Amino acid sequence: MYKEGLKGLMIEKMKEIKRVFAEYFAILDNQPNIIKDYADYIEHHTAMTNNNKNLELQKIEIENMQGLLKRLEGSIKPEYNGDLEYIKNQYSKLQVELAKASEIIKAKKPEMMTNIDREMDTVKKYIKQYESNLMKDKFVEETCAPADVLKELNELKRNIDKQRDKNDYFTKIRKLMDLTTPPNKDLADLEMKYNDRKLLWTHVDKLLKCHEDWYKTNIRMLDSEDIQKEMQQFDSTVMQLKLRINNLSQDGKDKVLEVHEARIRKIAGLMPIISSLA
């Protein structure tokens, strides 16, 4: 019973380690020519190298199991000996192939660095374009419908996120290549500018909707305390945006913010009347 269990376990272990060797060689045979494949190649090579000692221990374990089985049975099937020799040869071959892969990674590095730099330059180009777009047209026109502006802002956000994903992806690959990449300050600045522009138009939209609801409601049915709280939030946001005005404008002024603030002041001026009648 013990011998059969040992034999079954040994067969399973031999089958598994042969599967791993086949998988590894298939990967190492495909030399990378594009950035993504190069990154995958490095990751696979690293994983294989880290697992190399474990494979050696598995090889030794199988060898020991065969030795024990031979002592228990007096002999062992020739096919098992053949499997063990095959595993030993495959392990030796793997050491050679891993060394070759290291050389391939080194040889391909300059080419891939050039390709990545080209991709990062494209990211920079889009960042400048999106920043320019954010500072013009309906994004800074106080007469535009907030719903239309917010729709376009959401589309712009999707495009910015694509560049963020690309930036992070190529930064990750550079790290795999043992290269450091400084934080993308221009992208971070663009994201802050976008967030403040989105915040402004979100509050413009909210204030207009609140004002419309208040206007349609019988004044005696209005809750002056709730309105006061809403107005305080609007006012607080305006103060925050004025402190970060450079995210909205290059000259320290933003017409959308100015009109929004004026609208808040006008409604705030009506609060004593609302409070007395509500």
What do these predicted ranges mean?
Residues M1-A278:
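Extended alpha-helical scaffold segments
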